[in-house]
């Protein structure tokens, strides 16, 4: 079984040989803007891929990386990137939130892939298409959980939202 580690690489410079680690795959998603998040993927202690993005800064944490089937989904800045390991293969990168993607989740009963963004909660497919995306009155900074049939997000003002997993509509 291969081990995978996600590293915060705030000082990494793309297309430079003057980095602490050398990654064989680089993807800069910043579009020419200043990168606020750079995450390295290390497999079995070997640096394999590095992803950089603009938007709100993110650091690796327990909900940054999701393994679903044979693919991994990684939150980097305002993006979700999809890849597999053994050998490494990059599939796609998806701008999932206008500001920041806080985490990537999978509902255990339905298999729905959900991103918890700062401004939006979104459901996306394994092929990188957004099925629905919805927002609230304020930023979703005070909590997030998946339940059978709905995603629950709490905004900055403490308002609780329950979004149906099938369509993203607010449930009572």
Positions of predicted regions on the chain:
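Repeated scaffold domains used in trafficking and secretory/extracellular systems
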Residues: 2-30, 50-70, 95-110, 136-150
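A short beta-strand motif characteristic of beta-propeller blades
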Residues: 46-56, 89-95, 129-135, 170-172
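Extracellular-facing segments of soluble proteins and assemblies that are Gly/Ser/Thr-biased and enriched
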Residues: 65-95
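Short loop/turn segments that connect beta-strands within the blades of beta-propeller domains
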Residues: 68-69, 76-78, 108-109, 117-119, ...
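Structural core positions within WD40/WD-like beta-propeller blades
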Residues: 73, 113-114, 152
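WD40 beta-propeller blade core
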Residues: 81-82, 122, 161
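Short loop/turn segments that connect beta-strands within beta-propeller blades
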Residues: 85-87, 125-129, 165-167
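Acidic, small-residue rich beta-repeat scaffolds with periodic aromatic anchors
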Residues: 143-172
């Amino acid at each position: 079984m291969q081990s995978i580690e996600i590293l915060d690489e705030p000082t990494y410079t793309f297309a430079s040989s003057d980095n602490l680690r050398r990654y064989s795959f680089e993807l800069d998603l910043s579009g020419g803007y200043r990168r606020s998040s750079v995450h390295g993927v290390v497999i079995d202690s070997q640096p394999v891929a590095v992803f950089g993005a603009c938007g709100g800064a993110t650091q690796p944490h327990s909900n940054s990386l999701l393994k679903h089937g044979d693919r991994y989904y990684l939150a980097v800045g305002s993006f979700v990137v999809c890849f597999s390991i053994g050998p490494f293969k990059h599939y796609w990168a998806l701008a999932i939130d206008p500001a920041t993607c806080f985490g990537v989740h999978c509902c255990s009963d339905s298999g729905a892939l959900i991103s918890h963004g700062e401004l939006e909660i979104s459901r996306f497919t394994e092929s990188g298409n957004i099925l629905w995306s919805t927002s609230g009155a304020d930023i979703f900074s005070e909590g997030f959980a998946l339940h059978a049939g709905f995603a629950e997000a709490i905004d900055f003002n403490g308002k609780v939202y329950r979004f149906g997993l099938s369509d993203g509509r607010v449930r009572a």
